């Protein structure tokens, strides 16, 4: 038989993530996923005590009866607890550590961001992410993020499954993500599985909460930099636990006005010339069984006055929808995402011609997940159609204009095998670049060996490709403007020979270990890594004549050891 369901916070009806659900006295157990979902399969018929343990919540116990070839669906609500962790909770954390590979990934919860000292009293992901190993952040030089040697354009940024092209404001202290509406942030610094594609370095996967389904609440805050308003609450309620809820967040900055008062030592004519506005809204409808549908939208903008005669700015907006469907009588979970996003950027300088760029994308994905005992099979299809434009004039007065439409299609599959002492997750991605007529076969693998209960060895690796190119050279650290284009029609290597394969490529190798000390009170994580950038495409800074190539091919390698 099978027992499955969702785990929720009783006070808000928000899903409880990554908590351990198990049958007491057995080896049957699993952690909830990003949606609070769990599925324990292949359970012999009988009566069991279903237990849920979590760091933040009181333990949950319920007696259930499982019948052969039958599926039980449970809706579990946990109450918050301030009681010190007991052995059951510690055991749950240990199970999760042993059964989740966790190579080159940092999972960030909102509470971790909020307890960290922040600039201006406003906790933000942009400030937190700088504390992570392997991350280099340029801060007030445009907020560019370099992860284990990869450039910013090589990072895949997702907001509720929607493509985002610039997650940080120009001042660098703030991201576009309001901490009060975040549910979870997964940061993959390398070696990510085949579920993610189209980028060669890293992934930042941001998920927002659905909104409080039980009561209305709001928050107004202000500091010398920004002010914001957050609202959430139920739209409709159902006695059986389902309903519709919303969450709305708006934030504006006024640093360009307040800096003249608070920071009079700044040697600029009009204080600090930065301003931005962020708006995000989401509506979610959930059934009593846990299936749900969400619709959301955002609008982010940023402005910077570089000097009295230069202006810079970008606008980013998008709309999308997600669903989770739990078929009755089936051991699978079906989920999907569809949406449209757009990013426009421009700069006007007194000594140069205007530069501008625009990228817009429609993306669609459909995923199927099957649970077999502790193991998992997941596969899906993805589609991205984008258009890019880039307009600039070089210092030598050569006009560069690039306008392209591209289509990327992908299918992936991954299998996670969980045994008593090891976990292995091979995956494969087929990425088709329709505009280039190129099919890329991208194998990935990750694994963990539990040498003892407290010492675990882990490793991951894979092959990655991408088509998107940034017009900012990696050698320009201080440069707010970055246009986006797809692979150019003509491309040459250092010997001026034509390059037929016009995608960017990288290979990742990661290995390391985890060590728990003093009854799990101290956790040590060490990860050596190598990223080989087999083919990078960069703007040609040495272009002098019209027939010189606009872009050149480069190679690179990044290596190091991360301690956490």
List the model feature ranges, each with a label.
Residues 313-320, 327, 344-347, 353-423, ...:
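Outer-membrane beta-barrel transmembrane domain signature of Gram-negative proteins
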Residues 225-254, 265-303, 311-335, 370-377:
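Transmembrane beta-barrel wall of Gram-negative outer-membrane proteins
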């Amino acid at each position: 038989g099978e027992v499955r369901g969702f785990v929720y916070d009783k006070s808000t009806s928000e899903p409880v993530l990554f908590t351990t659900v198990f049958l007491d006295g057995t080896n049957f157990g699993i952690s909830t996923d990003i949606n609070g979902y769990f599925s324990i399969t292949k359970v012999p018929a009988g009566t069991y005590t279903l237990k849920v343990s979590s760091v933040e919540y009181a333990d949950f116990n319920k007696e259930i009866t499982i019948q052969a070839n039958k599926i039980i669906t449970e809706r579990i609500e946990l109450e918050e607890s301030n009681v010190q962790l007991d052995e059951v909770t510690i055991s749950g954390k240990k199970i999760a550590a042993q059964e989740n590979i966790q190579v080159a990934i940092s999972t960030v919860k909102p509470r971790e961001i909020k307890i960290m000292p922040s600039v201006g009293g406003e906790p933000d992901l942009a400030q937190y992410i700088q504390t992570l190993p392997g991350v280099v952040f340029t801060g007030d030089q445009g907020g560019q993020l370099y992860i284990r040697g990869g450039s910013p354009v090589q990072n895949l940024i997702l907001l509720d499954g929607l493509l985002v092209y610039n997650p940080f404001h120009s001042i660098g202290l703030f991201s576009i993500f309001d901490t009060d509406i975040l549910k979870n942030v997964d940061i993959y610094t390398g070696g990510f599985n085949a579920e993610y594609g189209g980028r060669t370095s890293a992934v930042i996967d941001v998920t927002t909460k659905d909104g409080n389904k039980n009561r209305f609440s709001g928050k107004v805050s202000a500091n010398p930099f920004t002010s914001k308003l957050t609202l959430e609450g139920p739209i409709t309620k159902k006695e059986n636990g389902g309903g519709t809820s919303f969450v709305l967040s708006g934030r504006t900055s006024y640093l360009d006005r307040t800096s003249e008062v608070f920071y009079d030592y700044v040697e600029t004519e009009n204080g600090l010339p930065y301003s931005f506005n962020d708006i995000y809204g989401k509506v979610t409808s959930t059934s009593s069984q846990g299936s749900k549908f969400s619709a959301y939208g955002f609008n982010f903008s940023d402005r910077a006055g570089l000097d009295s005669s230069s202006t810079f700015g970008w606008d980013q907006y998008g709309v999308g929808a997600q669903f989770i469907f739990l078929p009755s009588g089936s051991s699978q979970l079906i989920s999907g995402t569809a949406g449209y996003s757009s990013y426009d950027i421009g700069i006007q300088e007194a000594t140069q011609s205007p530069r501008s760029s625009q990228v817009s994308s429609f993306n669609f994905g459909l995923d199927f997940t099957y649970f077999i005992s502790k193991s998992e099979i997941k596969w899906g299809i993805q589609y991205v159609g984008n258009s890019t434009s880039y307009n600039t004039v070089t210092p030598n007065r050569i006009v560069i204009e690039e306008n392209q439409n591209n289509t990327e299609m992908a299918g992936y599959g991954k299998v996670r095998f969980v045994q008593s002492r090891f976990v292995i997750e091979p995956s494969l991605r087929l990425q088709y670049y329709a505009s280039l007529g190129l099919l890329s076969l991208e194998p990935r693998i990750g694994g963990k060996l539990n040498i003892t209960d407290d010492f675990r060895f882990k490793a991951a690796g894979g092959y990655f490709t991408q088509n998107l190119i940034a017009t900012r050279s990696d050698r320009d650290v201080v440069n707010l403007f970055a246009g986006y284009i797809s692979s150019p029609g003509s491309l040459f290597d250092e010997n001026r020979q034509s390059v037929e394969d016009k995608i960017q490529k990288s290979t990742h190798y990661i290995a390391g270990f985890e060590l728990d000390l003093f009854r799990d009170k101290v956790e040590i994580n060490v990860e050596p890594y190598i990223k080989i950038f087999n083919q990078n495409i960069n703007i040609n800074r040495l272009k002098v004549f019209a027939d010189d190539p606009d872009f050149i091919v480069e190679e690179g390698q990044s290596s190091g050891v991360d301690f956490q």
